Amino acid sequence: MPLSEATIKAVEATADLVAAQGLDFTRAFYERMLTRNEELKDVFNLSHQRDLRQPKALLDSLVAYARSIRKINELQEQGLPVPAERLAELQGFFAVAERIAHKHASVGIQPAQYQIVGAHLLATIEERVTADKAILAAWSKAYDFLAHLFVRREEEIYTETESSEGGWRQTRSFRVEEKAQITERIFRFRLVPAEKGTAVALHKPGQYLAVFVRDPRLSPHRQIRQYSITSAPNHTYYEIAVHRDKQATVSGYLHDHVAVGDLLELAPPYGDFFLEYREPGGQAADGQPSPEPLALHGGAVNFAAERMTPIVLIPGGIGQTPLLSMLRFLAEKEGQAAIRPIFWIHAAHDSRARAFKAEVDAIKVTDLPGLRTTTFLSEVDETMDKKGEDYDFAGRISLNRVPGLAELEADGANPHYFFVGPAGFMVAVEQQLQAWSVSEDRIHFEMFGPFKPLQ
């Protein structure tokens, strides 16, 4: 049921009070919940609790919801995804709503868990913000309203994935068919179903897999991590590339303890950052009717790759992984007949960080001869790095220096830009695109870890 005017006003009136509490509020919430319901430690990424990324993401989302609640209420009958014509009104909340729903699906969130979260959220509001019974009742109704939206959307996501060819719900056992070290800190894993001869669901290029690990050497709790799929969509296998972070637990475990033949538990592919290809005549790559050239899902604009529209892939560091899946996909779908301009613009710390250089070079030579590649290296080793071969420009990324790109934008070709990488890199790329007055519907980005708006 729609929320009453009294409920909406009460939540709007206290949104700033919650915001003023800052991270103290969300840290208190998580401490309370994870102490009283320790089973949820099997769901939450505890490293994101320690570095405060998850508390910050929750605070931003909660405040955005409270401030947008009136307009969200107007759309409650439609649920998610939000109609494109209303998206601009709700950027504060729906910019992250669909992304959150996919992340929840990847860790297997169930409706009963929303009740647990809601109880602890209300208790934290009472302890930290106000004990006013009318306001607490309003927040209770507002939370139930929000939980209903997410439960409904997540069930749609679960059902869609489960009903697809090769699809499943929750987790499924996969065997490590290949494991290869491609740089000092990156291993590639090829994963096939444990049940020989069974299909896997097609992923959309840019999506990720959640890997479920339970090992006492890591933690007494189950660990879940999401890794971007690097392979092109197929029904036989998935490939992921795992970068070992300095403070990592699960990536280190996968590097050091998981071998060929071992089994891993995986959730299906999820994620709202992807390139969705449209065949001529309005058909999606899976053959389903697709009359709309752009598919809007929450706050993410998932580009439908029309034949002439330029595509610009801009990875920073390990941000190559989801974009490599897009590049492989385009190479398979279009190949040497490709008529669109396609750019691969890689910004890396040094030449050793170019994990997929050989493959991108091979794609350019054999599959996409029109692919335009440009590399920026923050640090150049003049004793070993050759300009024009190992890199094109020294220093940080500058889109103005990419041959032909500024001209393409100025000519009104309306390229679509996909970028993934470290936070500073992503802010820099977005600022450069904004300086060119690139519209938001042509800017697509993914952020590893809890989502936060680029600033």
Residue ranges of model-derived segments:
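Short, conserved phosphate/pyrophosphate- and ester-handling motifs at nucleotide-, phospho-/glycolipid
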Residues: 206, 319, 422
